[in-house]
Amino acid sequence: MTATAVKTDYEAIIGLETHCQLNTASKIFCNCSTDFDSPPNTNVCPVCLGYPGVLPVLNEEVLAAAVKLGLAINGQIAPYSKFDRKQYFYPDLPKNYQISQFDLPIVEHGSLEIELVDKKTKEITRKTIGITRLHMEEDAGKLVHAGSDRLAGSTHSLVDFNRTGVPLLEIVSEPDLRTGQEAAEYAQSLRQLVRYLGISDGNMQEGSLRCDVNISVRPVGQKEFGTKVEIKNMNSFSAIQKAIEYEIERQIKAIADGEEIYQETRLWEEGSQRTISMRKKEGSSDYRYFPEPDLPPLEVSEQQKQTWFATLPELPSAKRARYEQKLGLSAYDARVLTEDRDVALYFEEAVNAGADPKAVANWVTQDIAAYLNNNRLTISGLALKPSALAELIDLITKGTISGKIAKDILPELLEKGGSPQKIIEARGLVQISDPDELTAIIQAVIADHPKELEKFRSGKGNMQGFFVGQVMKRTGGKADPKLTNQLIGKLLAQA
């Protein structure tokens, strides 16, 4: 049986567990700072270090963030929930248990729409992914392995407890994902959502967003799930996709070879582009959950929920729909513009200043995006203000300048800002749109090129394009290109 034949006979069942580190100023159960760049073991206190006799106190901002994200994913907010102790021993967990939520999470039964883009056609397919639950918990510390970037090969390990007690939201998806592309897109959509809400920076490199993948394969048409394998250690969206694609191939090959799939945790190795076995996967019974005795149950009133709901911004899916339906943008442009909330706000400011939405979309998604990418900048630091972009588009629309001149002055606007009107006046770049003035210039150009005129008369080559180029050269690109083309066609026909 060929590998291709085997692969088409199976489907992958994929779910993601995503840990989102919140950007609160203090930790979830104490007043210690959450500053990422602090020296090791400086943002600690008896509470987050698990000293005897101390009591945790819930940071209300964590609850607010959980409810807001729950509302954003159309989840059911629990009027009553509680915290639980998750028991396990590891050097980065000083209490030997983690305060989390087990059977009564703050949010259940949500969903998130993802968009899958065809790279060739740019067509978009939408799919809704169910979200089983969202719950609050505290982060563990960070192990630093001396002598190696991994445990294997290191001489000893150091523990930084600064991260202990930093608030996390864990979002557990339904097993609705089928490919690595879908999983990576889901993770990106989740990051986009927490950034729009302002509750996390979603930075995977710093560990603000961490994804664990649960994956199994089964024959197409079979209802029962296969044996689930967990994959960890993916620090980018491309790593999520590659790890899943590798694991699908590995499991299908193992089944085809008559091997057993074990329920285990595997690590993604970026260097070798493969997953390796780490440990046998634990079940919930292994953690011996029981209710946290030092924290009272949580109650969220309808009034509290409505207060937090009123603070939600326009979410990405709503923005995309508005851009398509009211502004007439393509689904692809709407997607690109809403990927980053600051880009969307920039676009909207330019449109509100009077510019045509499609023209603004073209400039933002093409020339401006290229400049930002090449210079590793964000749009919030761009010298070209939205109002100036609207002014530039207006100058083109009115025929004051050509699109070519607009692109010629764009680098200065991007780097230094300023008024497009003042720049073209200072440089003498106002477009020549007077028919009489252009006619005189064209007649002079034709008179200066008798050989080319003869070629035109004999029907050789695209000589009209030659004369347009000569007019543009003589006017320094200031001639109205559309009017120039029309007048040249008319004058050449008469010559």
Curated annotation (Swiss-Prot):
It comes from the Bacteria. One of its GO terms (biological process) is glutaminyl-tRNAGln biosynthesis via transamidation. Disulfide bonds: none annotated. It holds the Pfam family GatB_Yqey. It catalyses: L-glutamyl-tRNA(Gln) + L-glutamine + ATP + H2O = L-glutaminyl-tRNA(Gln) + L-glutamate + ADP + phosphate + H(+); L-aspartyl-tRNA(Asn) + L-glutamine + ATP + H2O = L-asparaginyl-tRNA(Asn) + L-glutamate + ADP + phosphate + 2 H(+). The keyword Nucleotide-binding applies. The keyword Nucleotide-binding applies. Its EC number is 6.3.5.-. Keywords: ATP-binding, Ligase, Nucleotide-binding, Protein biosynthesis. One of its GO terms (molecular function) is ATP binding. InterPro entries: Asn/Gln-tRNA_amidoTrfase_suB/E, Asn/Gln-tRNA_Trfase_suB/E_cat, Asn/Gln_amidotransferase, Asn/Gln_tRNA_amidoTrase-B-like, GatB, GatB_C_1, GatB_Yqey_C_2, Gln-tRNA_amidoTrfase_suB_CS. Belongs to the GatB/GatE family. GatB subfamily. Allows the formation of correctly charged Asn-tRNA(Asn) or Gln-tRNA(Gln) through the transamidation of misacylated Asp-tRNA(Asn) or Glu-tRNA(Gln) in organisms which lack either or both of asparaginyl-tRNA or glutaminyl-tRNA synthetases. The reaction takes place in the presence of glutamine and ATP through an activated phospho-Asp-tRNA(Asn) or phospho-Glu-tRNA(Gln). Heterotrimer of A, B and C subunits. PANTHER family: GLUTAMYL-TRNA GLN AMIDOTRANSFERASE SUBUNIT B MITOCHONDRIAL AND PROKARYOTIC PET112-RELATED, GLUTAMYL-TRNA(GLN) AMIDOTRANSFERASE SUBUNIT B, MITOCHONDRIAL. This is Aspartyl/glutamyl-tRNA(Asn/Gln) amidotransferase subunit B. It comes from Synechocystis sp. (strain ATCC 27184 / PCC 6803 / Kazusa).
